[in-house]
From Swiss-Prot:
The keyword Cytoplasm does not apply. Keywords: Endoplasmic reticulum, Glycosyltransferase, GPI-anchor biosynthesis, Membrane, Transferase, Transmembrane, Transmembrane helix. Disulfide bonds: none annotated. The gene is gpi18. It comes from the Eukaryota. It is a multi-pass membrane protein. The keyword GTP-binding does not apply. GO terms for biological process: GPI anchor biosynthetic process. It comes from Aspergillus oryzae (strain ATCC 42149 / RIB 40). Its EC number is 2.4.1.-. This is GPI mannosyltransferase 2. It is found in: Endoplasmic reticulum membrane.
Length: 434
């Protein structure tokens, strides 16, 4: 496998020195994307970014005209689309109801860290976390496992999320939290197999904490709770087949606590919003009187038209076409994970579990989201990276397998790079899609 992959990778990437190579590739890629964005000639059709530095003094027509023609500073080139809301929330807190559609956890963290720096740092560490997660699953004692780990981390650098992983968006932080959560979860399974029960339980709870924070950053983080639901069902099955034991009950208790911790990432921001809007002297908003008073669900439907089949219009067909390759990869990789037999028990266990959040995200994006966002929110789900890499060989689980279809792999990489370049140009010019 090593000989075949050597033909497909540039000299810059050396699997024998993975951290150095990944770090160098990461910062070169980030510099390249940044230069593209700041080199874009104009603000595009929307000048909302220009209002941010002058908002308090922009009452007069002369000021507004000055804003319209003012050159944007380099940092503001990265403030596009949703990031305008993030920057406003950090500066003025949650002022408008519709702003609660944007991750509460992410805006709180932005209050302490520079947004662009946070995005770059989080993306960098998510690359390293993906490498370590892949090592846990595929092993590092064989050439095949080491290369899968290295190349999947490389794909994460140039993934279709592109400029959104550099801008003040929640995707990079979510990616870091979710992938690191998967790493701790897989480490928990490894410790459980080795008989290290205390360590396994501790890592499982730490993984739940990261999934909870990820859910506060992006609500789709709640899908990682499917891992805990799966584990709970396994423990219940053991009770029915093996009888009740202290070890099984303890593990089940840890799993249930972990699931509750993840749910807090969704519940706590909703409770804060409820106390703000529904427990004041002001007239109640409509969502306050719903059976489940969720501001997030309300603003998504009311302001952003997000809901089941709401995006299924003829005018949005180009966006479905744009999202199709990633939707296909997400669905196909979930099926692949369920059907592929691996020699390592940990690989089979983790991949089977990851198929659930991966596939659910694709289905929800297709039926209920603004479908094009799948190209950026998929960055925090590692299954499709592994699927692409493993298609290079006909028997990926065999360390002596020979690489095939390397040309297809090269075309896929070239397509991702071209997409990222075009997307960076459109993003820098404030042009859709977002």
């Amino acid at each position: 496998m090593a000989a075949g992959l050597a033909l497909a990778r540039p000299n810059l990437l050396n699997p024998n020195n993975p951290i150095r190579s990944l770090s160098l590739a990461f910062w070169l890629w980030k510099a390249f994307v940044f230069l593209i964005i700041i080199g874009c000639p104009g603000p595009g059709y929307d000048t909302s970014t220009g209002l941010l530095p002058y908002q308090e003094s922009a009452a007069s027509g002369a000021k507004l005209e000055a804003i319209r023609h003012a050159p944007f500073s380099f940092p503001l080139k990265l403030v596009r689309w949703d990031s305008i809301y993030f920057v406003h929330i950090v500066r003025d807190d949650y002022v408008f109801e519709q702003e609660w559609a944007f991750g509460y956890g992410y805006t709180r963290i932005l209050s302490f860290l520079t947004s662009v720096a946070l995005s770059h740092i989080a993306h960098y560490f998510s690359v390293l976390a993906l490498y370590r997660l892949s090592i846990n699953i595929f092993g590092h004692d064989n050439t095949s496992g080491a290369l899968i780990s290295f190349l999947s981390a490389t794909l994460h650098i140039i993934c279709p999320a592109g400029a959104f992983l550099s801008a003040p968006y929640g995707e990079s932080l979510f990616s870091f939290l979710n992938i690191t959560g998967y790493f701790l979860y897989s480490s928990s399974l490894l410790d459980a197999n080795a008989g290290k029960r205390a360590s396994s339980d501790a890592k499982l709870l730490l993984a739940a904490a990261l999934f909870s924070i990820a859910t506060a950053v992006r609500s789709n983080g709640i899908l990682s709770g499917a891992l805990f639901a799966f584990d709970a069902l396994l423990q219940l099955r053991k009770i029915f087949t093996q009888g009740i034991s202290g070890d099984i009950l303890l593990r089940l208790g840890v799993i249930v606590v972990g699931g509750c911790v993840i749910a807090l990432g969704l519940i706590v921001p909703q409770w804060i919003a409820y106390t703000t809007f529904c427990m004041s002297d002001e007239p109640l908003r409509p969502w306050c009187e719903q059976l489940i008073p969720s501001i997030y669900g309300w603003v998504q439907v009311h302001y952003w038209n997000v809901g089941f089949l709401r995006y299924w219009t003829l005018s949005n067909l180009p966006l479905f076409i744009l999202a199709f390759p990633m939707l296909f990869l997400m669905c196909r990789s979930s099926i692949w994970a369920l059907n592929t037999a691996w020699p390592l028990d940990t690989a089979t266990a983790v991949l089977t579990r990851l198929a659930a959040p991966n596939g659910l995200l694709a289905v929800m994006a297709f039926t209920s989201y603004h479908v094009q966002i799948i190209n950026r929110i998929s960055s925090g789900y590692p299954l499709w990276y592994w699927y692409i890499i493993c298609q290079l060989s006909s028997h990926v689980a065999d360390s002596s397998s020979v690489v095939k279809r390397s040309q297809t792999f090269s075309i896929a990489i070239q397509g991702m790079v071209i997409y990222a370049i075009v997307q960076a140009v459109l993003f820098g010019s404030f042009l859709p899609p977002a």
